[in-house]
C-alpha cells in the first residue's frame, strides 16, 4: 500500500508531492481529492498526509471556522498524473511555530495513533522554518480567501510544506506536540475511512466533513517558494532513494554538528606567546625604590605603581588582574581603560614576582657566605667535624707598659679532658696602642695526669734570644699593675684537630721592641678583677706575680704532680692539697737563653710526643722543675734548680704580693731542702696575698 504525502504551497497551484514505496515524487496537474474538512481563509493548510484508507490534515487556525466544501472523491483515485521524479535530501524543520493555545487536535483512530507517534517528532521539527509569515505570526488577521469552492485557487493556498517526511513507509506525519502558551497552530488529526469518518472537533467549533482538492505544491522557481522547495528528512527504509537520502542527510547533519562544535574552541583556544617587557633605567630605579619599601604590594598599590612608573601594556596576565576595578567610582571606566589598567598592573605584578625571586636567591647566597666566613675578625678554633664552640679572638685594651713579644701558652689538663686555652700569659701589644688579640687554642699531648701548666709552645717571628723566668731585682707586683684578679674562665673541650695545625697562632701581633722576655706583667686589673668570668670559654689562669705562674690543679684529692723526669719518689712527686693552687717559682738567676722559635721543651716534667728527652739533666736531679725552655742546640745550661712548688691556701687569692721575691737570693736547693722552700713560699704567700 502506497503512502501518500501531499504538501501544498500558498503561492503556486497545480503542483503537489506524493510519496510511495519508491520514493518521493512531484506531480503536476489537478491535485488529488480528499474528503471535505472544515477550513477557512485563515486556516493555512500546509500538509495533507493520506493513504487509501485515511488522511491527515496539518493546519494552523487563526480565526473562526468556515466550511470549505469540495466534491468528494476517493482519496487516491488517480494517483499518477504527470509524475516527475525529484531527489529530495534535506534537514528537519519544525511544524509548531505560530500555533495558538486552545486548539485541540482531531482524534485519530487506533490504527493511526501509532503512525502519529512515530512521525510526530519529524512533523514538529519541520514546521517552524518553513511556515510563511501568515502562519508564524500569532494573532495575524487575514481576510478569508475561499468560501464554498472545492478546488478554488485561494482555497488551496496553504502554508509551505515541511521539509521532512515520515521515517518509515508505514508511518506518516503526525500530531503536534502538546500545545504551549501563545501558540495557535495545532496539528489536528482526523481518521478517515471509506464511508466512515470519526473526528473530534475543537470545543465550541462545529465542523463538517468537506471535500477539498489538494492544493498544488510549490516549484523551485517561484518567488516565495524557496522555503517550499524542501528536502524532507528521509525515511527509515533500507532500499531505494529513501535510504540514500537518509545516509546523505545523516552525513550532512553530523558534519555540520562536528564543524559547529569544533569551530569555536579553535578560535578561543589560541595560545598567545608572552612578550618581554622592556624597562628604561628610570623605571627600574623607581621600581627598585618601591621594592625596597614593600616586597609584597597589593593589587591597588601595583596599579598605582603601574600608573606612576608608566608601564606600557605589552602583555595581558591573568594573575593580579582580577581586582583591578575595585574601588573605582564615578561613571565607571570603559572597557579599554580596564584592559589598559589590567595590563599595566599585570606587568608590574610580574616584575615584583621576578624581583622577589631574585631577592630570595640573594638572601640564600648571603646566608651561605656568612656561615662559611664568620663575621668575627678573630680566629676560630678550628673547622673540624666536632661540635666544639668556635672561639673568636677577644681584643683587649692596650696597656701602657711595654710588652715584649711572646707566644701563646697552652694548658695541660687531665688526659680525658684536654682543655683549651685561648689566652696568652702576657698578651701581645704592638708599639703603639694596638689591641691585644687572644690566640687560638693549643692542645697538649696526651700524657699522664698532670697540672694545667701553661707553657709557651708556639714560635714567634723574631729570632732574638732572651733570658727566661728572670726576676727583676727588687721587683714587686705592687709597682706593676696592682692587685690582679684571677682569670675566671670555664672549660671547653677542644675539637679533635691535629695538634701541629694549632701550634701556629692564627692571630697575634708582634712587637718591635727588643729586650728580654720576662713574665713580669700581670693582666689588666679592671678586666679580670670581677669574680664573674669575662672569657667563659677559657681555662682558669690565675697569674698573680710578675715572675710566677699560678696554676689551678684538678679537683682531685689524689693529684700527684710529676716534678722531674727522673721519677724519684722523694723528688718526683709532690702531693698537694685538694683545693690549693700551685705556684711555680723561677730559678734564682739567669739559667740561659732560649729561642721562642723552638717548639720543643726538652726538660718538661712530662713526656710528650713532640718534646724529646731532657738534655743533660742528671737522673736524680735536685730541681722539681727542670729548665723550662730549651736552647736551639743541646748546649749545657746552668744547672740551677727549677722553681719549687708552693701551695697557696684554699681561700687565698693571687694578688700583688712578692710570691717568689726571694728566688734570686736562694742558693740552688737540693732535694732535702724542698720542704723548707715550700714553707717559705707558703708563708710569703700568706703575708702578701689578701684573701
Curated annotation (Swiss-Prot):
One of its GO terms (biological process) is regulation of transcription by RNA polymerase II. Pfam families: Homeodomain. Transmembrane segments: none annotated. The keyword Nucleus applies. Expressed in ovaries, testes and pancreas. Expressed within all stages of the adult female germline, from primordial follicles through to MII oocytes. Keywords: Developmental protein, Differentiation, Disease variant, DNA-binding, Homeobox, Nucleus, Oogenesis, Premature ovarian failure, Transcription, Transcription regulation. The keyword Transcription applies. Residues 94-233, 366-385, 394-437, 635-691 are annotated as: Disordered. GO terms for cellular component: chromatin; nucleus. Residues 94-103, 679-691 have a biased composition (Basic and acidic residues). Residues 272-363 bind DNA. CDD domains: homeodomain (cd00086). Transcription factor which may play a role in oogenesis. Binds preferentially to the DNA sequences 5'-TAATTG-3', 5'-TAGTTG-3' and 5'-TAATTA-3'. It is linked to Premature ovarian failure 5: An ovarian disorder defined as the cessation of ovarian function under the age of 40 years. It is characterized by oligomenorrhea or amenorrhea, in the presence of elevated levels of serum gonadotropins and low estradiol. This is Homeobox protein NOBOX. The lineage of its organism: Eukaryota, Metazoa, Chordata, Craniata, Vertebrata.
